[in-house]
Curated annotation (Swiss-Prot):
GO terms for biological process: negative regulation of DNA-templated transcription. Negatively regulates transcription of bacterial ribonucleotide reductase nrd genes and operons by binding to NrdR-boxes. This is Transcriptional repressor NrdR. Binds 1 zinc ion. GO terms for molecular function: ATP binding; DNA binding; zinc ion binding. HAMAP family: NrdR. It comes from Aromatoleum aromaticum (strain DSM 19018 / LMG 30748 / EbN1). The gene is nrdR. InterPro entries: ATP-cone_dom, NrdR-like_N, RNR_NrdR-like. Its cofactor is Zn(2+). Residues 148-171 are annotated as: Disordered.
Amino acid sequence: MKCPFCGDPNTQVADTRENEGGEVVRRRRRCPKCDKRFTTYERIDLKMPHIVKRNGNRSEFEHDKLAGSMKLALRKRPVTLEALDAAVDRIEAKLLALGEQEVPSEKVGELVMRELKKLDKVAYIRFASVYRNFADVDEFAEVIREVKARPKRNRPAEPPEPTSENDLFRS
């Protein structure tokens, strides 16, 4: 790989590490000509499907846009960045598993709502209110009733205390 500092094409790998899941390989490289070090990342390049918007326009799938919209819904909620990243990964895996070249934006929105409902009910309601474009307060109240009617599974009496500096509510 070419050195980003001096342009020499003969760099050497000094260290190689995989992340926990094995999806990304991190390499520390050294240039023998200028003796500078730099880091590269190697990951599988999967072709995500294009997104077909409601108006018929098509756009490339954007990981950052998906994560950003979910992060906005989760703002000031006690959900860690790790939990958000895992949810985004699950959505991307489901989109890839469809095996389609194009996916309607409605499908992506439904997957996001499903993941947000698992992570945090308030974030789910926030996202649903924008995504479904509620016409009036009654539609909003109906979603709240739906969420409240679901049985609560192993829920602690009080919300958990933040355990990480990465808690989204601190941003």
